[in-house]
């Protein structure tokens, strides 16, 4: 008989997904899944990339959903109170929490461990890069570069606007014999894409040991030997400079990192910063320019922004 678990559903906005995921990771959550309507709309517009699409998902096109999975124990009510209060307080940090509704349901272990996989199919995210889950088959076209990925439930599937913009920027700016640093590497998707696009050496860093483990596993799936994954922050665990530093995080962290990051970029190198909500674009640009970066280009997709700046 399948074990029963408690599923906490938070109905929110795309803007608040990362913040709410962070709230859940501060509790005893055993798994997190994300349903982002922006990803769903993207997949509907690119039907050739999918061999399965559940039209019922479009019924929640204005609502993003974060689900956390818990064992039923003495601490659950404490976790639930913390989640509700933290979600309620997001407005104080300038984050649109959307509906902000929190619900609890009982589910079987099988339901949450594997069902999410059926919605995750190979997706072309740039001119060359196709993100392919490791359990799917895909007929590669001649010019395509395949990134094999098992994101697990803790990380995005690589189709979010912020990730797509980063990959497209890497595709444009990476040249042979270049070094790339990936800050907050998560599943390793940007590090892997950078290596497959021709970077000579890639270093990915993340403070989360789960991310470090996930990145290393995904690198093995792609048979790459020129990527190094380190646990910690860039300033403490990495030596040397890169031609490109990429960070797909959030605006406040990018602003905080900007001065330190400058010392890790070669003259003439680029800082690709994404994960920035449109309302924070000018704040990030201002900080970059104050620090000596020259804005090369600003890309926008939906409510998200990717800023590419340069050290001259």
UniProtKB/Swiss-Prot annotation:
It is found in: Cytoplasm. It catalyses: L-lysyl-[protein] + 3 S-adenosyl-L-methionine = N(6),N(6),N(6)-trimethyl-L-lysyl-[protein] + 3 S-adenosyl-L-homocysteine + 3 H(+). GO terms for cellular component: cytoplasm. Its EC number is 2.1.1.-. The keyword S-adenosyl-L-methionine applies. Gene3D superfamilies: Vaccinia Virus protein VP39. The keyword Flavoprotein does not apply. It comes from the Bacteria. Keywords: Cytoplasm, Methyltransferase, S-adenosyl-L-methionine, Transferase. GO terms for biological process: methylation. Signal peptide: none annotated. S-adenosyl-L-methionine binds at residues 163, 184, 206, 248. GO terms for molecular function: protein-lysine N-methyltransferase activity. Belongs to the methyltransferase superfamily. PrmA family. Methylates ribosomal protein L11. This is Ribosomal protein L11 methyltransferase. The gene is prmA.
């Amino acid at each position: 008989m399948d074990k029963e678990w408690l599923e906490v559903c938070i109905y929110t906005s795309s803007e608040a997904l990362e913040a709410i995921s962070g709230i859940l990771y501060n509790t005893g959550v055993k798994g997190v899944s994300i349903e982002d309507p922006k990803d769903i709309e993207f997949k509907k517009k690119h039907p050739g990339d999918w061999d399965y699409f559940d039209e019922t998902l479009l019924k929640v096109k204005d609502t993003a959903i974060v689900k956390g999975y818990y064992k039923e124990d003495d601490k659950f009510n404490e976790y639930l109170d913390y989640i509700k209060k933290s979600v309620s307080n997001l407005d104080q940090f300038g984050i649109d929490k959307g509906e902000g509704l929190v619900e609890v349901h009982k589910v079987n272990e099988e339901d949450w461990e594997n069902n999410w996989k059926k919605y995750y199919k190979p997706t072309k995210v740039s001119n060359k890069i196709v993100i392919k889950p490791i359990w799917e088959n895909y007929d590669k076209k001649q010019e395509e570069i395949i990134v094999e990925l098992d994101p697990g439930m803790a990380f995005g599937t690589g189709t979010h606007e912020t990730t797509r913009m980063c990959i497209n920027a890497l595709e444009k700016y990476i040249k042979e014999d270049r070094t790339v640093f990936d800050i907050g590497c998560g599943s390793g998707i940007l590090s892997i894409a950078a290596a497959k696009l021709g970077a000579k050496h890639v270093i990915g860093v993340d403070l989360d040991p789960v991310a470090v483990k996930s990145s290393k596993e995904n690198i093995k799936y792609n048979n790459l030997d020129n990527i190094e994954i380190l646990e910690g922050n860039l300033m403490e665990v990495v030596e040397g400079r890169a031609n490109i530093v990429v960070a797909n995080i959030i605006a406040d962290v990018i602003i905080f990192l900007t001065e330190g990051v400058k010392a890790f970029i070669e003259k003439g190198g680029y800082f690709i910063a994404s994960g920035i909500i449109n309302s924070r674009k000018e704040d990030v640009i201002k900080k970059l320019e104050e620090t000596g970066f020259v804005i090369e280009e600003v890309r926008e997709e939906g409510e998200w922004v990717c800023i590419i700046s340069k050290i001259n």
